[in-house]
Structures are given as structure tokens and as C-alpha cells.
């Protein structure tokens, strides 16, 4: 019973933690202040790592791989002209900004926890991947990014994120 309660509360902590990270990252992009994204992400990851002590090494590896993959994918979106992110570095305007990298780290921390119910549910995984453009629409609405050539961009973003997102173990 105690293990059940802890497992459910850990999922809730993980979900709420990522929600805070997501909003702080998008707000960080809108404000052009990376600290707004870094601090909540760091706190969330510390809390997350304290929960996943039984497979900490694998979780850290997954997050690092996801950060690298996210950097490549979102930088490609910018380089191809699909998305213009706010908060980029002056000397590397097509490099995905820090707030996007923080978002990838936070998102990946959910994969083996909040999204664990997706294991083996391939249609649901595809549907979840197709919802990714909604995050870009919300980010655009808040002022963190501008999506250009809307239909083509959102289609491309959906396909890329569907194929690049790690799946639950």
C-alpha cells in the first residue's frame, strides 16, 4: 500500500514539476531571460533524480541524449526557417535557446514515469506525438517563438518530434 501511494505521488510530482518547467521555459523565452528556465529545471531535475535512484545512471544518460537530440532538432527547425525562437544567442541565432534545452530535459524526465502508460500503445504514442505542435502554438501565443509557414511547419514539427522523442522503457 505504501509503495502504491509513493509511486502515484511520484508520478504526480513528476507531472506537476514538468508543468512548472514548461511554463517557466516558455515564459523565459518570451522574456529573454534564461534564468527563469534554468532554476526551475534544475530544481525539478534534482527532485526527479532523488526519486529515480534505482536507475539514476540510465535516467541521466537518457536526459543527456535527449538534450543533444533536442538541440539538433530545434536548431534545425530554426535553421530551416520553420521557427524563430526568442532568447537565442546573438552569435548563434539559429542555435536552439537555453530555454528549449531546459524544456527537453524536463520533458525527458517524464518519459519513464508520467508517460509509462504509453508502453505498447502505438496509436496513442502517435497521437501524443501529433499533439507536439500545440506546444509550439502555445509558445507562440506567449511570445517565446514565431512559427513560419504554419501548415508546413507544424506538419514537419509533428513528424520530427514523433520520430525523435524517446519512448518509455
Segments predicted by a language model, with ranges:
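Membrane-helix boundary elements
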Residues: 75-93
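Hydrophobic, lipid-facing residues on alpha-helical transmembrane segments of integral membrane proteins
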Residues: 12, 16-24, 60-76, 80, ...
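Membrane-interface transmembrane-helix boundary segments in multi-pass integral membrane proteins
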Residues: 149-162
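N-terminal membrane topogenic signal
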Residues: 1-15
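Short, hydrophobic transmembrane alpha-helix segments
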Residues: 24-33, 50-53
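Conserved small/polar residues in nucleotide/adenosyl-binding loops
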Residues: 163-169
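Membrane-interface helix-boundary motifs at transmembrane edges
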Residues: 50-61, 116-120
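Short, aromatic-rich membrane-interface segments at the entry and exit
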Residues: 31-40, 58-59
